[in-house]
């Protein structure tokens, strides 16, 4: 008995393409959720009062201008193109920080992630890495949160996580 194909090739290809598109939308949606959670966490860290001469209490830095918190945000990119995120609302007078954050996130995507689906969470001010290296929590606890949420995301989408 011969095997006979009943489904047209283009119908099968279309079905596979639709399923890939559906999975991609689900991944982007879930990465957005993780990005929003990480940004909300990082921006909500307490800032000690900035009395004259007072030093910050680690792990929290003093947020004098709002630029650093305003530069914290996320983007989701597919094959080097930002598809979601990119909103960096200003806190206090932190308009400069918001612009720096958007610019830095786009640079990171273009430079580091030309292929695949990625979530990039950034603190775009040039001194963010310096504060983090000195022990202040700029994005550190947000990174821990992401490391917890990503495996949950993958499992919910049917991927095996080891």
Region roles according to the model:
Residues 1-3, 20, 27, 147, ...:
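N-terminal targeting and processing segments of secreted/endomembrane and organelle-targeted proteins
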Residues 1-22:
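N-terminal, Lys/Arg- and Ser/Thr-rich interaction peptides
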Residues 132-162:
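Protruding loop/beta-arch "assembly-hinge" segments enriched in small, turn-prone residues
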Residues 10, 63, 79, 137-140:
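Acidic-enriched, low-complexity/disordered segments with a strong bias for Aspartate over Glutamate
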Residues 18-127:
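Short, low-complexity, charged/polar segments at coil/turn and helix-coil boundaries
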